[in-house]
Amino acid sequence: ITSISQSSSYGGQVAKYGGFATLEHILYFDATESASGTELWAYSPLNGTYWMTEEIRPGSAGSKPGSSTGLIPMSGKLWFNAEDGTTGSELWSYDPTSGTAEIVADLYPGSSGSSPGVFSGLVPISDRWLLFDADDGSFGIEPWVHDTLTGQTSLLGDINPGNSPSLPGYLLPYKDVGNHIVFDASNQTYGTELWAIDKTSQNWEATMVCDIWQGSSSGQPNSGSDDPLVIGDRIYFSARDQAYGNELWSFNSVEQTCTRESDIRPGSQGSNPGSVSEGFHNIAGMIAFSANDGTTGN
């Protein structure tokens, strides 16, 4: 469509960090050229024009928009992480109406940056909330939410107390399931297990909903598959326990219970469901996935 950089050194460096996103018929992407480095650009297919939306980080270093979050369109704005050279990597937004970009929250004061979305990405929920992981320098890497309606950014819990990280959403990214937002997180007491936020609660706070492998060992929800599956008020995912190994599990948002749905491979080795089928797939109301029963292979 166009050549943004006139230098062969930067050729092909389009959508390298944040990918592509569309908002109100405009295509947004990160692009690199020698004078401003990597910044947020836009292209209009209506008139064939392209432009740099804003130079968030002045100079040739570039802000690398979307490097950990991607570019997320929601509520009439574009949301992403960026580095302005002063605050480090933080959450930003771009408003196409005003044509300006602004920092949403400086969660880690100073130049270090909170590095939002490194493990979970930036996940839009119900066209209002943005869920992500971040490190504010006090609590370690924990779950955060930004409410695009109120403009508030809040910590959802110190799951792993102190400055140790809980790595929320690392295995099972934030998923909207009924009245809950479900994800995995880790602490020293329970290991890596399934956690949730009740969207109907006045004050959102993360709580553990299932200790699949009881004690400090980890159930590792969704560790063996690429993508869990949400059907109605349930989410299906792989998880392991001491007796059955890695098998198919579900969480019921209404009853707030976890259930092992199968023992495909008897014994503690497990069938590793979804490991080679890119997770679980809804086909006419049935869940299709790969598994190894120990006899026929995957």
Regions found by a protein language model. Give the residues of each.
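Feature 14080 marks short, conserved micro-sites in well-ordered regions
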Residues: I1-N298
